[in-house]
Amino acid sequence: MLSFGLGAIAQGDKSSCPGNLSIFAEFAKVKNYDSAYQPWKEVLTTCPELNVATFKYGERILAHKIKNASDDKTAYVQELMALYDDWITYFPTTKSGKSETGKILSSKAQAMIDYKSGSTLEAYEIFNQAFVQDAASFTSPKSLYTFFNTTFNLYKEGSLSTEELFNKYEEISEKFELEQTNLARKLDVVLNKEDAGEPVTSREQRNKRVYETNVLAFSTYANNLDAIISKESSCENLIPLYRKNFEANKTNSVWLNRAASRMDAKECSDDPLFVELVEALHGINPSANSAYYLGLLKDKAGDSQGALAYYEESLTLEQDQYRKAAILYKIAVKFKTKGLKSKARSYAKRALANQPSMGKAYMLIANLYAASANDCGNTQFEKRAVYWLAAKTARRAANVDSGVKKTALKMAASYEGRAPSKTDIFTEGNAGQTIRFSCWINDSVTVPQL
């Protein structure tokens, strides 16, 4: 019979605790969780305050027990729930004093969903408690996604309003962006050293692999987050919702910025409400975002010079290099849509100067090159050689950004398939030669050796 919760358990002989801690830790390190269970349980029951390892390894031990239980898993699931509660009681912070409450509570809520323990509402409330009390340590992309999926399920059941759904979507989306930016900052330190030819330590290489794994996870779950709400976040739904709440929020810069951002992202910016949102936002809080949106309005009015002036003002107002990179990329996309390839590349390169790990900027440039194949080069061979440059640029995207790696590699393979074949190179007899493109690309490629 398993026992839960430590409050009612009398503290026994603590002399065996250090030995049992050492025993279960050694078993757990080699994933022999069945052997680790009993000494771990004795430490948890007798001296839970001894070491945080009791809770970190305990989470893994109980996950193993739940997965491999031959009969009813309920007892182990309940024990896991109690473990999270006791974890917060005994080790709510790290050694340096940073709160772990958000991490622990979100792990508990995730386990409730994974093991179908408790109701959807109960899991939501614990997720929300974690997010409100300590968002800083609530960093798991899976749990952030599950938090919103739980929110969405409650909305579909009628327990949450449309407004509550969108508010939570904005909050969680912003958290995803924050964590992705934090990862980019760390990854770019290593990328900059590599690009400069500086030696990279083995620790930095290991860290880079961890960053890349996390970048991919955040990218995947962020895309899934958007997919959940795609139908609800149509212009037909957004505009009436924002119109209804505009008067009450026209001096709320956070609300105005979120509404304008969502309308821009969903291409609802042709509606007059977008103009009202942007003007209200810029009136109470002139910022990089509001200047960018004013640039959009100028663009839509056909005033390209006025738009560019606002875009540049936006960049001047923005002090953070990663937010600046995001704005530069959006401007690059606008110019690409207009067919202004050289300007689009220029802004994409400026984005990369601020965030070297922004793979989508390299992909945009690769796409610009591929779209110019018929406009560059004097011969058919030279025109098709542009695809080598496009493929090279797409591969660079894959190398710096694991979040787009799969798509970028497919793009590169597609471009390489359109480039001259080995037979073409043999016929031309130009293996190893350099081909320079004198069009707007103003770059060169080396013909592959046979």
Kindly give the residue locations of the regions a language model identified.
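Solenoid-like repeat scaffolds
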Residues: 10-11, 41-49, 89-94, 129-137, ...
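Generic helix N-cap/helix-start motif at coil->alpha-helix transitions
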Residues: 12-20, 51, 99-107, 137-144, ...
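Terminal, low-structured helical/coil segments at or just beyond the last alpha-helical repeat
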Residues: 396-450
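TPR/TPR-like (Sel1-like) alpha-helical repeat modules
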Residues: 45-48, 75-90, 122-133, 160-188, ...
